[in-house]
Curated annotation (Swiss-Prot):
Induction: Up-regulated by antimycin A. No effect of ethylene or cold treatment. The gene is AOX3. Unable to fully compensate for the loss of AOX1A when electron flow via the cytochrome pathway is restricted. Belongs to the alternative oxidase family. Homodimer; disulfide-linked. Its EC number is 1.10.3.11. Expressed in roots, seedlings, leaves, flowers and sepals. Highest expression in the senescent leaves. This is Ubiquinol oxidase 3, mitochondrial.
């Protein structure tokens, strides 16, 4: 069970505890962490300044020397892992980590059945041609470009649904959170790969250009036809699954070094300490397959004439 699932189970109980005890945000977080397995909270007291070992090595201070986090009542909380070492990541917390469902079918394909489907499918097929010609078997570079693009659809969709929810004074059915989770998960893929390889200047230039063009194009597509946008993303994720399958084949064939997994990957996907690059690519491929299903699912809902809020949102779906 993931920390996120545990949180959803405990949330009603903890919420009532917060209301009855008057705990603040920091106190609530400490109360939550105390219920999580294999996680130990060293300090969560927000009622008094944090001092000593609970302060970061170089805290940000105001002009008169006050530590900003303490001044605003948001002191850092120290969390330890089961082996006693400190949790060192600020970009995600223990309850954001999870064990991926690697049993998902990675060969599933949505067969285009109408004009919109065919347009989405051939758009993706056309876009992948220059990418394949440029990267060929340079899997790490290809993966980094792929993840900078793959993190865009969830953010755009979540943002537009957020604005729609505010504009219409109605709930989104959980789809805002689901799509933003997808975007964050894709970003974590990128953060993992940059631990293994740094892009060259021209690759950064390509990312800058491609991301700018794709963000605006996808934004317009989502405004005009969300079902088309989700279908495009579904096919993009199918290609992502295929590219990671090729990556795995080359690792298995000895064409790409199976180096140790970076620490961030071990903590994020709760991998064993001796995990390798192959293990990382394997779980990332599973993530992409889940994103594929989410977006084809979202498109199918809208093709049937329904709004996303009418169907259960796949929150925490990995």
């Amino acid at each position: 069970m993931s920390y996120r699932s545990i949180y959803r189970t405990l949330r009603p109980v903890l919420s009532s505890s917060v209301q009855s005890s008057g705990l603040g945000i920091g106190g609530f977080r400490g109360h939550l962490i105390s219920h999580l397995p294999n996680v130990r909270l060293l300090s969560s007291d927000t009622s008094s300044p944090v001092s000593g070992n609970n302060q970061p090595e170089n805290p940000i201070r105001t002009a008169d020397g006050k530590v900003i986090s303490t001044y605003w009542g948001i002191p850092p909380t120290k969390i330890t892992k089961p082996d006693g070492s400190a949790w060192k990541w600020n970009c995600f917390q223990p309850w954001d980590s999870y064990k991926p469902d690697v049993s998902i079918d990675v060969t599933k394909h949505h067969k285009p059945s109408n004009f919109t489907d065919k347009f989405a499918y051939w758009t993706v097929q056309t876009l992948k041609i220059p990418v394949q010609l440029f990267f060929q078997r340079k899997h790490m570079c290809h993966a980094m470009l792929l993840e900078t693009v793959a993190a865009v659809p969830g953010m755009v969709g979540g943002m537009l649904l957020h604005l729609k929810s505010l504009r219409r004074f109605e709930h989104s059915g959980g789809w805002i959170k689901a799509l933003l989770e997808e975007a964050e998960n894709e970003r974590m893929h990128l953060m993992t790969f940059i631990e293994l390889s740094q892009p060259k200047w021209y690759e950064r230039a390509i990312v800058f250009t491609v991301q700018g063009v794709f963000f605006n194009a996808y934004f317009l597509a989502y405004v005009i036809s969300p079902k088309l946008a989700h279908r495009i993303t579904g096919y993009l994720e199918e290609e992502a699954v295929n590219s990671y399958t090729e990556f795995l084949k080359d690792i298995d064939a000895g064409k790409f070094e199976n180096s140790p997994a970076p620490a961030i990957a071990i903590d994020y996907w709760r991998l064993p300490k001796d995990a390798t690059l192959r293990d990382v690519v394997y779980v990332i491929r599973a993530d992409e397959a889940h994103h594929r299903d989410i977006n084809h699912y979202a498109s199918d809902i809208q093709f049937k004439g329904h709004e996303l809020k009418e169907a259960p949102a796949p929150i925490g779906y990995h």
